[in-house]
Amino acid sequence: MKIITQKYEIDNTVSSRISNFFKTYRVGSILKASNGCKSKGVASVAIFQYIFSLVFFNRSMYMEMMSEKRVNGFAKDSVYRFVKSANINWLRFTTMLSSRIVSTTIEKLTDEERINVLIVDDTMFERNK
């Protein structure tokens, strides 16, 4: 008999919340509108969701690929090609996603008399290595 660890339950919770986020804000359609679609192979939204989830699981892609429970169905080269693709307009993607989040969620929290402002900070920062 195997014991289900607390980490497994947390991973499932985080994974379901990430999926809910992608469905609620229709990240796939925004990615497609930003030229983030592929002609063959694994869907680009699946690769993007995988990269997005790595941040919240606090894991590296290398360790995730080496783990026994690997279920993503694509190789690291697919991820690298997706990230380095010159066709994807990342500025348009971040702007459209921010706009969708504001219009569907945040705008409802403010008074109608207030002026709406969208500030997207995409500055680069250095990480200690």
Would you name each region that the model predicts?
Residues 1-129:
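Short alpha-helical elements
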